[in-house]
Amino acid sequence: AGSSLNGGSMKITYIHHSAFLAETEHACLLFDYFKGSLPKLPEGKRLYIFASHRHPDHFSKVIFDIAAEHGDTVLLLSSDIWRKRVPEELKGAAVFLKPDTVWEDDVLKAETFRSTDEGVAFWCTVDGHTLYHAGDLNHWYWDGEDSQWNENMTRNYRKEIGKMEGRHADAAFLPLDPRLGEYFYLGIDDFMKAADADWIFPMHFWGEFDVGARLKALDCSRGYRERVVEISRQGQEFSI
């Protein structure tokens, strides 16, 4: 059984690492899947499979098997993924997106932002819902890294997040990476200062499920800590 966050009509399933499945009235959105147990996909809903970049913890050719099995599927792939990776029979379903691109069909609108690592982040509007999946767009401020590198990172991340100024997402999937040590919260904190989200789903936390609780314990999260979803296991479902 799933957790009802506000009893809404969109179902979110945490799969693994940065992979989530969102199900709305007419669509299913699968983000950055490379492994993990996938819920049964309902027939009659278009499947959108997103891959934010080519890193193996965000992209796998297994998504092409999922697409072939489901049928009505659109593959929304970052332009850094090699086109020749896509099987011939799925080439017509694949769209390669650079940063700062808008793509839409009769169900979904997807906008891309430039990652501070590789590839893109996705801002999606579907069935009256808005979702933001950051991919690896994050404030990667590493302890021990060259100070100039970290300053550039801060500037680049805040510039990109600034493009989202005033936007609102029903669900935001954001990296909360414990490898960053004391700076692990910066990406989410900057995002919430620029934009807004009803629910923040941490991701990219390498199995450390307590990161949400750790973020909530920080003073800086006072204004949004009630909206941080504490994910406790793979396969966990939420209704929002």
Question: What are the residue ranges of the model-derived segments?
Answer:
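Core dinuclear metal-dependent hydrolase active-site scaffold
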Residues: 5-44, 93-168, 233-240
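Short active-site oxyanion
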Residues: 10, 71-75, 199
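Active-site metal-binding motif and surrounding structural segment of the metallo-beta-lactamase
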Residues: 35-84, 162-173
